[in-house]
Design a protein with these regions (language model features):
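Short, well-ordered coil loops that connect the C-terminus of an alpha-helix to the N-terminus
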Residues: 1, 65-66
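A short, conserved alpha-helix in the catalytic core of glycosyltransferases
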Residues: 1-32
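Nucleotide-sugar-dependent glycosyltransferase catalytic core
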Residues: 6, 23-24, 31-54
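A structural signal for well-ordered alpha-helical segments within the folded catalytic domains
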Residues: 12-13, 50-54, 58, 88
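Generic recognition of well-ordered alpha-helical segments
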Residues: 17, 55-59, 96-100
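Conserved beta-strand termini and adjacent loop/short-helix elements that scaffold enzyme active sites
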Residues: 28-30, 36, 109, 113
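Non-catalytic, C-terminal membrane-associated alpha-helical segments of glycosyltransferases
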Residues: 50-51, 66-129
């Protein structure tokens, strides 16, 4: 995973890089993994969802081709707010994204190619979310 993502959607960014590199993602129902929660618990839901939204902005900027980048930036915010029950700070997520954009050592923007976009659609996915 990229070190830019402490928590939230880091697997999506990794999947974009894998697919864009020409690899396929295979579902194998016999392989099971368990995500363990830290004994101290998670941070408050609002903080977690805000970080997730900021990470989505970063991932979209890094990997989404146009026009999907713009569509994603506009459409994903209400999508996340709906599913998170309004438990996210859009303003704070935008500030986190803006801070990340100003970092001198941040990764360069490398949108996924057309073959990766076709693969995502062929698997039943959508590029905008």
């Amino acid at each position: 995973f990229l070190p830019d993502f402490f928590y939230g959607l880091e697997e999506v960014e990794l999947a974009y890089r894998i697919i864009d590199g020409g690899w396929a993602i295979r579902y194998e129902p016999d392989i099971v993994s368990e995500e363990l929660e830290h004994p101290a618990g998670r941070r408050p839901k609002r903080d977690v969802q805000t970080d997730r939204l900021a990470n989505k902005y970063i991932i979209s900027y890094l990997r989404m081709p146009q026009p999907w980048l713009l569509i994603n930036m506009i459409a994903f915010t209400p999508y996340l707010l709906y599913f998170a029950g309004g438990e996210a700070s859009v303003g704070r997520a935008v500030r986190q994204f803006a801070t990340w954009l100003r970092k001198a050592d941040r990764p360069r923007r490398r949108p996924i190619g057309k073959a990766a976009t076709r693969y995502i659609r062929a698997c039943g996915g959508s590029t905008w979310r």
